[in-house]
Amino acid sequence: MPGSASYAILFLGTLLEALVVVCAIKRKVLRRYFVLNLYMVLCLAVSWGRHYVLARDGFGSLNYRYFYFYSDALLTIVLYFSLISLYLSVFEEMRVGRYLRLGALTLLAGTSWFTYAVVSQSSHKILTYFAFELSQNLYFVGLVLTYVLWAAVLKMRQTPTLLVQLVLSLGVYFSFFAACYALSNLHPTLYARVSIFFPVVGCLLPLSWAYAFWRVPNDARLSPARLAMAGVPR
């Protein structure tokens, strides 16, 4: 996405990321969803970094590509922990936070080890390749975990509406990127085409979170189980 379109999308994404944090502070949910807001703050910092490298070296430069892949790996790891924080919120009353944290760290370590085992067979720019592959694998892991979490949410009698909105938006986000990476793995030539849409879709997650923080009342609750039953034909 060369030229002015790149700058426009990056600038829009930066504004939306800042808006998420502002809305969270305004609605007094910053501490409750601290990891999600930390992710947005890091996104904001990375966006400014990408602005700087893009303006200095250009979209097709190696410096921009390296910065993009390394920063994307970092953001994906933090997004993974953002998802785990939603697990902690859903299962808060069950007091299983310790086990969830241990399981999350074990899963991340296992994913990292698997990724390294795959990329270690290639001696060409192994660190960059590792960052790229780790991001891909974490998107697939995040996709599975999000739908497992959603299945658990559907079993609950009442769930905060805001939490439901956040889980659903993450599900859509992980689904898109996992599908794009799956297609690019099947047909490597497609990556250059589908990656054009990454910055655009990247704007949708902060947009949905900002909307949820701003519009959904903190005390609003709904019954996902009833919604699931309502969708089943009798």
Describe every region a protein language model picked out:
Residues S4-E17, G58-L88, A104-L108, V194-P206:
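Individual alpha-helical transmembrane segments in multi-pass integral membrane proteins
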Residues S6-Y7, S123-V148, M156, S195-F198:
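Extracellular-loop-to-transmembrane junctions of the mid-late helices
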Residues E17-K26, H51-F59, Y70-L102, W113-S123, ...:
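Internal transmembrane alpha-helix with an interfacial aromatic "cap," most often the third helix
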Residues C23-V35, Y87-R101, L127-T128, L154-V164:
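Membrane-interface helix-boundary motifs at transmembrane edges
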Residues L30, V46-Y68, S184-Y191:
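Helix-loop junctions on the outward
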Residues L38, L42-A45, D72-F81, L100-S120, ...:
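Alpha-helical transmembrane segments of multi-pass integral membrane proteins
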Residues F59-Y70, K125-Q136, L162-L166, T189-P199:
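Non-cytosolic membrane-interface motifs at loop->transmembrane helix junctions
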Residues V148-R234:
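C-terminal transmembrane-bundle signature of multipass membrane proteins
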